[in-house]
């Protein structure tokens, strides 16, 4: 039995996009940037897969050095890149199914702190310690890619 028609799914998807856009704008306007960033980062942490963190942790525990860990993790996660001494997660498109259909300019780039939390959860879970993640580029704010620098 079909639970929803295609048009109902499209309508629900558009409604969710409007809801998220309104939520982010409301958070930013009413609780401020710092709190909004913390909330979104926590949401991203919850979106991270426990099995992927475990896989990354296993790679780290078997690696003889940070470089070996990053090289091996990069083989299983193609978005991980090293540029000199810097480590990045780079996405050529927005993979967040909650917002990637929202037209450019309708959603604040502050939303991408959700992805920042996802990246932090991955590396903190693997390394067993805090890391800092800096959002350098964001498709939502008009950049051609999303780029997160991981400070290990």
Label each PLM-derived region with a short phrase:
Residues 1-111, 132-135, 139, 152:
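N-terminal accessory segment detector
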């Amino acid at each position: 039995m079909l639970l929803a028609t295609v048009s109902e799914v499209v309508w629900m998807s558009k409604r969710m996009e409007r809801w998220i856009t309104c939520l982010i704008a409301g958070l930013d306007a009413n609780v401020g940037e710092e709190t909004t960033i913390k909330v979104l980062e926590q949401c991203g942490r919850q979106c991270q897969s426990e099995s992927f963190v475990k896989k990354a942790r296993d790679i780290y525990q078997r690696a003889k050095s940070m470089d070996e860990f990053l090289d091996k993790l990069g083989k299983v996660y193609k978005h991980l890149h090293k540029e000199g001494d810097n480590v990045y997660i780079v996405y050529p498109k927005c993979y967040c199914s909650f917002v990637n259909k929202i037209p450019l300019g309708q959603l604040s780039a502050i939303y991408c702190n959700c992805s920042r939390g996802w990246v932090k959860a991955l590396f903190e879970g693997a390394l067993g310690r805090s890391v800092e993640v800096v959002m350098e580029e964001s498709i939502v704010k008009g950049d051609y890619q999303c780029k997160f620098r991981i400070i290990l």
